[in-house]
């Protein structure tokens, strides 16, 4: 049957991803394909390729060339979708052609034809391997095998049930026989029932507490539900806020679209302006070419003029040299003439000195007039130079005016450039806002996709919850069946519990499997979510890249426009430099012409003045020569300046060439940018179309959102209902678990009762044997020395010794007397049947029966006593209340090597009603030898102690019992310890002893009490007992044979038996009693009310006037070579 389930699951898994692919890749195309599948395959083959064929033929060749890459991708996606649809139609047709019988044989179950055809279609699409054999054969063979195995297991179970029923019938017969023989012991079961009722009450209280805790949990869950509802309302409000934001964003988008349209119009205007600017640039280029040609012509002229000037300068230099030679000759002549003039003047001075007195004023006026004439000539020369300076100043003023005009034009251009930059910044801001709106739209899309994914997850969780509910219903039905069987078989069958445990294990395994499946599904969902997030991140990165490319293009455009403006400015500056150079060249030409005119005038004057030169002419010529030399130096400086200007012109030509190259590159860039602008415009048009489609898509998404919100509301309600059902199922499971726990506890108790019954049967046989031996022994001992007759005692003290935990002896000093009496669920009982005879001496003989069967429960029941021991011990001391009427027992622990006998000597003192006890080891040479004496009081006040005088190196250890701790013992007790108390008080538990147990300590226990009536024994108040019973338990090695010895000293009878049981009778000759022994439950009053009845066989008899004491020493064998411990316990018994 597993093959069918696996096939169906596999087919479902195969089908599911193909549908998801179709939904994710092609949304509206799947609807078309479904309609075509409904009609006929032939129509789908004919209709689908028609629009494809019409598209390329409808347009011209230019349209086919204009198709962009996105259009081609779109067409390819359409082609792929149509091919997938064709494949699906082929698969459907193949699946329809298959025979039903073959499909049923393949998949192994009978279902409607459509389901099988769908599975076959998925198999064709997945290209799975075809089947080879019929699936019906293997499951039938496996079913036959399973049926045979079930039959065999059924037979085995029936055999086990028959064996169990037979054993149960035998036990019932044995129990009925034992009930007939021992009706007295059945009375004690009432106490056990009372304890069980108490346990039931306690369990009921626990159930009430659990119910309260469950109610609190339900309240907490209700609070959680309310918080979840509040969160749902918040989410709904958040969804409404999202819708409002979407509407607001759509309004912003419309505004942004308007802005984009305005920007496009502005861009068109700028394009027209750019075209005009390009035309102007072309005109300027033509002007620049013209200017270049003019510059070339002017440079050629300048070079020619320069050559002529250089030739003239060389001629002038030669003339100047000749003139200088002439001047040198003239200067020599002038020197000679001056010397002659000096001599003449000296002579004339002598003559004139005489004439000065007559004609002083006339001669002085003539010299002054000559000097005035010379000064006038110099002024005229200076005026000619001033006119030249005035002309230069006028030219400078013209240049300054031109510069001011050009600066004004440059300022206007700068203002226009700033306006253009402001417009570009505004356009960039608008584009940034548009990009932000795009990003917000993408985020909204992502949010919608996330909400889709959440709805899908919720639907998947609903499906998983439904599957869980089905499984829980199946579990509930099975659990109801198990409850019914449990109620029927709680008291009868033990084997069915194993079956129930197995079923529970299988159910837990199934639940684990389902949880694992859910975890796997959740992991797959997380993987798919991660994939979706990665895809969305990739889309976001692509959009960011597109935006970055756009911004880069815009920055390039901006940089290109800046560079163009800079080039324009540079061209204007260079034009200004050219104009300056032209003006300088004109100035130089004018200067050269003026120099040539001056030279001509100079030559003419020279020729005219050659004939008659005077001293004054010579001076004038000298001055002219000086001026000419100065002008020549000035011309040289001007030539140097012209050379520098020529160098500058060459540099400007190089720069012009580089600028031309840059201009060509910028033209290419501008063409490339224009192409990119056209591409961007195309993308903007496409984007507008996409926005139009997105608005319709957003409306559709909004509708889908509303539908999904309604679905999520329904899903949340269903989830709440499912949660309530799950809580109910959990409550039923808890109740079933409690019932199973109670069933296991009751089964354990039944096992314990059966073990007790077996032990009882064995113990009864042992008791009958011991009774016969005791009667025989008492008959042999009846004639005593004093003429008294020993009564037949019926003291049978059963003393149980537990297996020590971790092979260590238990510390009996810390145990309470009741705990000593009830160790490992067994009761130590002591019963005496004493016959009164005033003529015989009172010596009591008591046997101790230590044979028992091993019980495995003893080990389990030892643990609570250990726990109680830890709770009661504090520093080895136990405190008592001062008002208690009981003696605090003092314990003495004596070490003794096993396998060696002990010598005990008892000397009674009837005057003081005491007896001294001496316990000695016979070998004083060994290191473990010792002697100890104890004084045991027979009667007196109720508060008495046993004093032990030690003769060896043995320290007495005292411990005090605490009534307060014992009062608190019942509060800290577990139900197991209470069950052990109850079982310990029943007569069936009187001797389950393991023969291979370890050594037990010898205890000294002193308890006082008096029993005047049975009512007092049953009353909760402490009963004072007027006699003492000292019990010595010694643990040497095991001895199998019986030895009868008797030693009498000072009217005391000491009897040793075969298994080293020494019975010492201490009593006054006037007092003897016949009563059943009392073993008090504890030295505290509150614990005695319920347990004295279980410890006393019947009512307490009324006391007589005789008081006796008996000391019983019981040896128990130890297989391990350990030292034994001796503890003395005196017990007060009523007589």
Swiss-Prot record:
Encoding gene per record: FILIP1L
Composition-biased stretches (Basic and acidic residues): 52-65
Sequence similarity: Belongs to the FILIP1 family.
Superkingdom of the source species: Eukaryota
Region described as Disordered: 1-65
Tissue-level expression: Expressed in endothelial cells, colon and colon cancers. In the colon, expressed in the vasculature and muscularis mucosa. In colon cancer, strongly expressed in tumor stroma and the vasculature (at protein level). Expressed in ovarian epithelial cells. Down-regulated in ovarian cancer.
Keyword Nucleotide-binding belongs to the record: no
Modified positions (Phosphoserine) in chain numbering: 791, 1052
Gene3D superfamilies the record matches: 1.20.5.1700
Keywords assigned by UniProt, alphabetized: Coiled coil, Cytoplasm, Membrane, Nucleus, Phosphoprotein
Name by which UniProt lists this protein: Filamin A-interacting protein 1-like
